[in-house]
Every structure is written in C-alpha cells, then in structure tokens.
Amino acid sequence: MGKYFGTDGVRGVANKELTPELAFKIGRFGGYVLTKDTDRPKVIIGRDTRISGHMLEGALVAGLLSTGAEVMRLGVISTPGVAYLTKALDAQAGVMISASHNPVQDNGIKFFGSDGFKLTDEQEAEIEALLDKEVDELPRPTGTNLGQVSDYFEGGQKYLQYIKQTVEEDFSGLHIALDCAHGATSSLAPYLFADLEADISTMGTSPNGMNINDGVGSTHPEVLAELVKEKGADIGLAFDGDGDRLIAVDEKGNIVDGDQIMFICAKYMKETGQLKHNTVVSTVMSNLGFYKALEANGITSDKTAVGDRYVMEEMKRGGYNLGGEQSGHIILLDYITTGDGMLSALQLVNIMKMTKKPLSELAGEMTKFPQLLVNVRVTDKKLALENEKIKEIIRVVEEEMNGDGRILVRPSGTEPLIRVMAEAPTQEVCDAYVHRIVEVVKAEVGAE
C-alpha cells in the first residue's frame, strides 16, 4: 500500500482527509496516467449515494477535463457496474466514488483500467509520484482541446441486462427479500429481481445521502433475517453500499456468509463442468469448515492475503474463475472483473432453482467451525511477529490442535493491532486457545 492508495483505492473522511482539492489532483493525475497514450480519452465516473459524492465527483470531473479527457457521468451505480461499463463502453478508464461498507462520513475513489480491472501497484505508484511532486508539469490543453462532460444514466440498465443473461431461467415462484443498504443497488436490485419475475420484499432502498450502511446491508444481515421470517421469503440478499458484496439469509433466517456462498457456487460449478482447474481462491480468513467441505467434494483451494485485490491477482495468475472472501466479495471472473453482489445473488438463486433445493440445504453441506477473533492493541506490530514467546505459544497451541482447528495471528493493515483468530470444533475450546495467545501478546508487546 502507498501513501494515498490503500487496498481498495484512496479512502478517507470526506472533506477532511479526502478533500475536493485532493480529488481534483487524483482526477488530473490518475486520468493522465491511465489515458496518456490516447487522444481524446474517454473516462466514466459512477458514485454511491453518500452526500459527499456530488462534491467529489465535481472535483474529479474538473481534474479529468483539465487533461483533455472526455468524461461520462453514470450517476448512482454499483462498483461492478462501473467495472463492466468501462470495458463495454470502450473507455480508457473508469472511476468509482464510494467507501463501500464504511459509514457515511467516509468516501473513496478507485480506478479501473480499460480492461475493467483495478489498477496495478505500478500504476498506483505512478499516480502517487505525481501527487507528491511540488510542481504540476502535466500538459494543460486550452480551447477546443479541453475535455467535455456528458451523462449516461442508462448505464445501470445496460449493466443489469448483461448480468441478467447469466442465469438459466426466471425466478418465478420464489419470494426474495432484498436489503440494499440505502446504497448503490437501491434502484437496481429491486428492478433486476422483479424483472426476473420473483416476488420481492425490500428494505434499505430509500437513500437520502445520510443513511448508507446505517444499520442495514451486508454488515447487518440480522435485520434482513427478521424480514425473511416475517414475509416467509425463500431467500434474503443483503448488499453493501457500493454493491460489491453479498451476504445471504436462508428461508429459516440463518445467515449465509461469503464462505458458504463460495462453497455452494464451487460445488455447482464443479458438477456442471464450469469450475476452472477445479480450484477456488479464498483468503486466510476463510473458515476451516469451508476448506473441509471443499476437500470432501474433491475441490482444491488456493489461499491469499486478506483483500479482494489479492484474490483477483491469484485468480488471474492461475487462470481460475471463482474466488472471494468470507465478507461477501465473490468474484466470478467468467462474467466480471471484480466482486459483484448482484451477480453473485443471481448465481445463488439460479443454483436454488436448478437444484430444486432450499438455501438451508445447500448451505448445510458446509459445517462452519466455531471462530473467535480478538484484536490486541500493540506498541509495535513488527516486534510482535518476531517475539519468541509469542511464536512459542502459537507453536504449542497448534500442536495441541493436532490438525483439528487452526490459529491465525496477523497484523492489521491499517491500525496498530495484532489480530488473533482461532477455529476449533467447539466454541469453548476455540475461546480458550485465543485467550492463551492474547495474554502472551499483551504481556510482551501490549499497548496501555
């Protein structure tokens, strides 16, 4: 990660850390890096429903226009919608203004290249170098060489028509409950599932600029679970603010997370001959039960660091077509170049239709191991990982587990924290393992 770019673009509190002045520079320098080899390049911009979206969009547009780029505004649309349309509309770059599942005061800017993929580390480093220069030496076109701005608010419908064709039949006879987090999918998901002839119940579909992710969406699926039970729905689908995550709820009100969704997709794709190299890519945070369920079904797995960008890099490297995270980022690379909540939802409902099985039965084929994650504030993350007493207690606990569970101790990417996570056959055993390690971490490098 760089000075400005994190694992998912530039993020910060809008108008404090992510200011219009910075957004202008990001538009100007980012646009230049991605389009410098093209005459009159086209750049598309989408945003979620945050109140700060208009402010940052205006600044970004100004920066892009100042380089001579032609800018097309998509309005409110999901992140995967921008990724798809960047390639579909032959744009040289796409930009999404969103902070995903974060609270309303945050916002972010992420770029997509002409191929619809997020930027490489090298491209981000090139933009950062320009941002840090004391003098802006980029060309400044004048007169008719300046860029112009246009609107293409029909882009969302073009994207929906594309993902709709990935399912094998309509969803008539199913009652689907949707939670759109008052975010980017608020006007898209209800239209999509109604168009596929499902009966729908909705919540989180009244964005006002201030309520995105507020007690709703993929980080609060327990609210959707109540709606599913109240309405007698067959499935609940919860998206996050920018629509790149999905967490589901089965017909009994049980939460179905990203690991379970990946397993259901992997098993079906293997059975239908669609799973490339018979492999799923996941992160080190996926539940041990996920790996055991894959193994029982003859499917191999590839692990990466936490972050959907690392999952995507491994998928591209190995030629795999399914990957994701427990948090609900599911990447279906045959169809789209990033995590996509609505596309994942379509595939999940399609599997229910094709197998004629309820979601509880499909998800029940994977048994989740009890899990506990504890964050420990430390004085030095690097010292913690090198500390001999900490390494020794981890080794002792792993020996005691004897393969029937696992321990993961890793630093936070953004805070002075060490994350201690364990999975074991029972919650009691799991908790005991974690607390033994936490006590040693606190004693050795804990911050007051």
From Swiss-Prot:
Activated by phosphorylation. One of its GO terms (molecular function) is phosphomannomutase activity. Mg(2+) binds at residues 100, 240, 242, 244. Transmembrane segments: none annotated. NCBIfam families: glmM, PRK10887.1. It comes from Bacillus anthracis. Its cofactor is Mg(2+). Belongs to the phosphohexose mutase family. Catalyzes the conversion of glucosamine-6-phosphate to glucosamine-1-phosphate. The active site is at residue 100. Its EC number is 5.4.2.10. The modification Phosphoserine is found at residue 100. The gene is glmM. Keywords: Isomerase, Magnesium, Metal-binding, Phosphoprotein. InterPro entries: A-D-PHexomutase_a/b/a-I, A-D-PHexomutase_a/b/a-I/II/III, A-D-PHexomutase_a/b/a-II, A-D-PHexomutase_a/b/a-III, A-D-PHexomutase_C, A-D-PHexomutase_C_sf, A-D-PHexomutase_CS, Alpha-D-phosphohexomutase_SF. One of its GO terms (cellular component) is cytosol. This is Phosphoglucosamine mutase. Disulfide bonds: none annotated.
